[in-house]
Amino acid sequence: MSERVILAYSGGLDTSVAISWIGKETGKEVVAVAIDLGQGGEDMEVVRQRALDCGAVEAVVVDARDEFAEEYCLPTIQSNALYMDRYPLVSAISRPLIVKHLVKAAREHGGGVVAHGCTGKGNDQVRFEVGFASLAPDLQVLAPVRDYAWTREKAIAFAEENAIPINVTKRSPFSIDQNVWGRAVETGFLEHLWNAPTKDVYDYTEDPTVHWNTPDEVVIGFDKGVPVSIDGRPVSVLQAIEELNRRAGAQGVGRLDVVEDRLVGIKSREIYEAPGAMVLITAHTELEHVTLERELGRFKRHTDQKWGELVYDGLWYSPLKRALESFVAHTQEHVSGEIRLVLHGGHISVNGRRSAESLYDFNLATYDEGDSFDQSAAKGFVHLHGLSSRISAKRDLGI
């Protein structure tokens, strides 16, 4: 038996064509691996059978929904990760999990080569291949879409010439990637920055005006930075994301129209839908404002940004990212409590906070009777705080 190729299989055009193409061009058997990340759409058994129909000798479906939520989405929540302050890493956090399961499949099915369907223009090629280099540097990597400059038209022609059983159309306008954490849409008329998204771009979210008269108030509970309840009901991380996808999505929350800086050096326009992700990150950030000491919170905002950049850049398995997560884990010790939010008209509004770990002291903060803040200490504090400014002003202004 020739050495097998382990293919990251989505069920779409490119990876379906890749199964047949790899067999013809390399003579190697293909094992297709499809990962269920809560993306919805087609039944995964249908996807598995399609891989076999396209020529895979084996097709494996991995249910990684809970693993994805707890080991990939949760660190994103705890790091309040928004690349360029907007994008909650919808695709970026899924790639290292896919890599992990492809490497596992390679060991189990006699694979010496792993393959993906990424282009040479995007970030995902980096995320996959740096991931493979980190976990299994002995494996070879095959990237037919990138290395042989496939276009959609070429892929369709190959599928037709080789009777590959997949229904496609040259008119399909968008490239879509989705999982339970969110949905990413690009290409087509969206590549022209002045073009507004049309209704057919969206799937996870309703038009924000649909439920204009019925705002949704939700209370999210956290225990040490982990979402554990919604409106007092216990939930797993996956259940929290799924419920908030439905509720926030119904209010048009989580629509993002972004021009982002790709790792490869170009700017690209992306439309994201991430209702559950944006609500959870908003709630978690707000709870940290209540429970983290000032300097710790300030410093963590820097590490949050760096964590997001590392993940976006495909460095999930890097030493720095692991070190940052150790720091983040320490910061979550007191991030427990509840945040109340109103979801309405595409917006998230926080209107309530409570925590047994809160650093907010009512008696110190109030301006009413019972104020325990010693205002007589303020004059000396202000004098000392401004002392260096006063000294330098004397020199610089000649006073």
Curated annotation (Swiss-Prot):
L-aspartate binds at residues 119, 123-124. It comes from the Bacteria. InterPro entries: Arginosuc_syn_C, Arginosuc_syn_N, Arginosuc_synth, Arginosuc_synth_CS, Arginosuc_synth_type_1_subfam, AS_cat/multimer_dom_body, Rossmann-like_a/b/a_fold. Pfam families: Arginosuc_syn_C (PF20979), Arginosuc_synth (PF00764). Its EC number is 6.3.4.5. GO terms for molecular function: argininosuccinate synthase activity; ATP binding. The keyword Aminoacyl-tRNA synthetase does not apply. L-citrulline binds at residues 87, 123, 127, 175, 260, 272. One of its GO terms (cellular component) is cytoplasm. It is found in: Cytoplasm. PROSITE patterns: ARGININOSUCCIN_SYN_1, ARGININOSUCCIN_SYN_2. Belongs to the argininosuccinate synthase family. Type 1 subfamily. This is Argininosuccinate synthase. It comes from Mycolicibacterium smegmatis (strain ATCC 700084 / mc(2)155).
